[in-house]
A protein has these predicted regions:
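A generic structural signal for short, non-catalytic loop/turn and secondary-structure boundary residues
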Residues: 2, 27, 46-48, 62-64, ...
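Compact nucleic-acid interaction/catalytic patches
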Residues: 9, 15-19, 24-57
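Intrinsically disordered, low-complexity peptide-like regions
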Residues: 3, 17, 34, 39, ...
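C-terminal terminal-subdomain/extension
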Residues: 55-105
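Short coil-to-beta transition motif at edge beta-strands of beta-rich domains
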Residues: 1-12
Length: 105
């Protein structure tokens, strides 16, 4: 796994969780730091939307619909929760550069 790769991971919260696409930021021996990727935008508050980065090249990234990187929080996941054998894809170079600028704002 490398930075800006996209994988499916089981992301848990409280007593639940679901499989979702995640953007790899960093990998260690037993965990990875990621941003969640979501297609849910319209239902979010204006405040939350300001932290959502639109993936312009979502098809090239291997996603099946317009999606957003949730830069609100990073999530640290155990590597066992990530389907590392089957990466979805990765951000294009253009989206990588845009994301870095977005985060630096």
């Amino acid at each position: 796994m490398t930075v800006f790769d996209i994988y499916i991971a089981f992301v848990s919260w409280g007593s639940g969780g679901k499989n979702r696409p995640v953007l790899i930021l960093e990998e260690s021996a037993d965990s990875a730091t990621v941003f969640n990727i979501t297609s849910q935008y319209e239902s979010k508050s204006d405040e939350i939307r300001t932290k959502y980065f639109v993936i312009n090249d979502w098809r090239q990234a291997g996603l099946d619909r317009l999606s957003y990187v949730d830069t609100n929080n990073t999530v640290t996941l155990p590597l066992t929760s990530i389907d590392r054998k089957n990466p979805i894809g990765r951000l294009t170079a253009a989206d990588e550069m845009r994301l870095l600028k977005f985060i630096d704002q």
